[in-house]
Amino acid sequence: RLRVPLHVNLVEGYPVAPADELDMLVDERGAFKLDFLGLLIKGAGPQRAKLADQIERECAAQIARFVAEFPESRSGLIVDSHQHAHAIPVVFDALSTAARAQNCRISHMRIPEEKLSAYRACGRAADIGLANRAKCLILNRLSRRMRENLPRGCKAGPFCGVALSGSMDRM
């Protein structure tokens, strides 16, 4: 039986929740305005609580829409996000809270922790660009917090893909 994961999006396109309730997340056209780094910085700033509330509202709207289409997922929601935004503490916390509020049990969450030693072992470390190394370091740091705060019974499998992103065609 195929299970469909929810791919939460907070960084591209338009929200599911009313845009007029998400002024920290959307621009004047109602489109998402923050990327991963923007969410990370604002999530550590003085307006963290307001941002968390808006992220929670949008996550709840996305979960509700998803569960309406896939009601069986309520008892075992599989979650990840666009640009791995769910690794950001304010997003992770808001997403977890939104799932609980929607009476959804998160059974699996992608943790974007990538072991760069695997690339060294197979002779591919030189293929990892500086920007991708930085992304991996940031995501690995955030992933440790995620792992410590996963909902009870939630699983996270192995992950790879950030280190060589943008260069997969050279494989």
What function would you assign to each model-found segment?
Residues 11-13, 25-28, 88-90, 167:
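Surface-exposed loop/turn and secondary-structure junction residues enriched for glycine/proline
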Residues 8-10, 38, 85, 115:
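Short, flexible active-site-adjacent loop segments at beta-strand->alpha-helix junctions, enriched
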Residues 7, 22-23, 29, 156-159:
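Generic secondary-structure boundary/loop-capping signal
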Residues 15-49:
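Active-site gating loops and adjacent loop-to-helix segments of metal-dependent hydrolytic enzymes
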Residues 62-63, 67-154, 159, 164-169:
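Catalytic domains of cell-wall/extracellular-matrix polysaccharide-remodeling enzymes
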Residues 40-69:
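Cap/lid and interdomain-hinge subdomains that line or gate substrate/regulatory clefts
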Residues 1-13:
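Active-site beta->alpha N-cap acidic-glycine motif
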